[in-house]
Amino acid sequence: MTATAVAGAVLAGSAACGTAEQLSAGSKLDKAFDQLGKKKTLSFELDLDTDVASLKALDAKSEPAPGDEIPDEAAELISDATITVSVQSKKPIEESGEKDFVGMAMKISNADGDLAEYRMIGDYAYVRADFDTIGRMAGSPAPAAEDLPPEAGALKSVLEGKWVKFNTKEMREAAAAGEEAEGGPAPEPTLDAKTQKKLADAVRAIIAREVDFKTADGEDGTEHITATAPFRTLITKLFGEIRPLTKDLPPGMELPTDKDLKDAPDTKVTADFTLKNGELTEVDVDLAALAENAQVKKLGLTLRMSDGTKPTAPADATELNPMELMEGFFGAAMTDDAEFSESDLADLDLAEDEL
């Protein structure tokens, strides 16, 4: 949980050069992030707080090519989308490595229901999705399961929105065997503890100078801490402070240049942290001002935290072999190609004779 560790250090240090209010706010947020890291199960819920008109205005500002505009159906689905993530570890999350996590679940939903869900329990991954709804959202309807040939196998269950599962350990072993045949796997990107500390110190120094913290009492015993900063100034100075550490970062991590960031809006953005009994329960960020578009009336993100529940394996999931699934997919495609009949070939021969 590098991000949690860095965020905690940043928020604590941000008060060091500030007022008494800065000191109090930074200390409280530091403790709140520290409590999150000590949990073994944790759930996050991310809500996109927007509306169709704002999404359409944002899309229009990007000047899409004719025909590539966001469909109304997609805007409606995205406008109230929610992403829920739960994790479970054998150790406190702040001390956990990849092998310590024993369960993970992620779900994407909206007012109409669940759109897609993914769970990782032990060596198995479980997946299901509402392809009918997703197809409408993308403007490209999914094929009907009953229209698929027998060779499609488990692909039918996938399209019907049923739970399917596959063995991730077997997939990793197969991938490793392929990498060995090609000369060995590439080293995985890592961020060592020394580099993490350098990053935290660099970011903390900028936050202390550029971010304004304030505290206020809320309802039902909650407390609100707001952090406000001009967006372009903050991110430009953040990346400027981090850039000298590039040589210590994992390969492939490229940082944006000042030139890349010069057109970013410098509007002030505020994050509102909600604490209850000292625990961080919610973060709200209003991004509408960053759009610099009067038609974007509503564009916010809300992140809610809770203790979480243990992810469980769904019952009656159909086991599939990814290779068999691909064979079924290509088999279905070949079946469609087979419909290119002998009469079609005869027509081609005729066309050649006419040349």
Question: Model-found features: residue ranges?
Answer:
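N-terminal export and membrane-targeting signals
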Residues: 1-6
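C-terminal motif of bacterial Sec signal peptides marking the signal peptidase cleavage site
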Residues: 12-16
